[in-house]
């Protein structure tokens, strides 16, 4: 289905199932972290999936392409992003499989039935409100800083929304790993699988991907790290595979 583009918008090919997404370079375009998170979710994942802070809907659309789930919901608080994500869903004729809902992450368990999701994903703001320089663009500031919600909010709501044994998948920065693991465990979300992401094989980690299970037993698998570049400007085969090239 063709949809109307607003001023400054463009349509990008996602290289998956012919899916496309509407973006506005003057707003907040999705980055590699969202793609890596989608690739970290096992393809066999089915049932109901919720993406907290979905932005323009990139993660739900990629999960529809990569997993067995046909019941995916994206929750987003910013009206412009909600509207844009909805048009991307219609653009791909996925209205029957993906729903975009406007709402606050802090109120997610009031918007949706508790213990009703098999999996939750989130690419949350990485920086605390007092960390780093805030972007003058409100849209970008909300996406990058914990302006409207904290990771504590994300973990708390996730624990209420997941079914017992349900999975939580997130991407975040290594400098907050210890804090995030403590927060997860405080909400009965047991870390089960961790993958560090490095720009180069000999560089420090720049991101981590983590899977947690609600009510799971202790015991975490540390996976082989993901390396982004073979050399400057040249992606590794694993990155090409995740992107579908």
Where do the model's predicted regions map?
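Class I SAM-dependent transferase core
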Residues: 2-44
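General small-molecule cofactor/ligand-binding pocket signal
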Residues: 22, 99-101, 192-195
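Short glycine/threonine-rich catalytic loop with a Thr-x-Gly-x-Asp
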Residues: 28-30, 55-56, 202
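Residue-level signal for inorganic ion chemistry
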Residues: 37, 123, 154, 212
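Conserved SAM/SAH cofactor-binding pocket of Class I
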Residues: 40-133
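Mobile active-site "lid"/loop adjacent to the S-adenosyl-L-methionine
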Residues: 124-153
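Conserved Class I SAM-dependent methyltransferase catalytic core
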Residues: 148-199, 203-205
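SAM/dcSAM-binding transferase cores
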Residues: 204-245
């Amino acid at each position: 289905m063709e949809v109307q583009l607003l001023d400054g918008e463009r349509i990008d090919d996602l290289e998956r199932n012919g899916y496309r997404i509407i973006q506005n370079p003057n707003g907040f375009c999705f980055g590699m972290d969202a793609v890596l998170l989608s690739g970290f979710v096992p393809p066999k994942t089915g049932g109901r999936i919720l993406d907290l802070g979905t932005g323009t809907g990139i993660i739900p659309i990629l999960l529809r392409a990569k997993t067995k789930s046909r019941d995916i919901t994206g929750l987003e608080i910013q009206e412009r992003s909600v509207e844009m994500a909805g048009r991307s869903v219609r653009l791909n004729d996925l209205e029957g499989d993906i729903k975009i809902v406007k709402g606050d992450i802090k109120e997610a368990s009031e918007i949706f039935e508790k213990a009703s999701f098999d999996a939750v994903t989130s690419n949350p703001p990485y920086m605390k409100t007092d960390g780093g320089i805030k972007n003058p663009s409100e849209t970008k500031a909300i996406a990058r800083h914990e302006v409207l919600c904290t990771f504590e909010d994300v973990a708390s709501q996730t624990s209420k929304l997941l079914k017992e044994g349900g999975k939580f998948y997130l991407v975040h920065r290594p400098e907050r790993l210890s804090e995030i693991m403590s927060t997860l465990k405080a909400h009965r979300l047991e870390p089960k699988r961790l993958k560090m992401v490095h720009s180069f094989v000999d560089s420090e980690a720049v991101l981590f991907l983590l899977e947690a299970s609600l009510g799971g037993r202790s015991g975490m698998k540390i996976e082989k790290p993901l390396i982004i570049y073979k050399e400057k400007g040249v992606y590794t085969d694993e990155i090409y595979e995740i992107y579908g090239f």
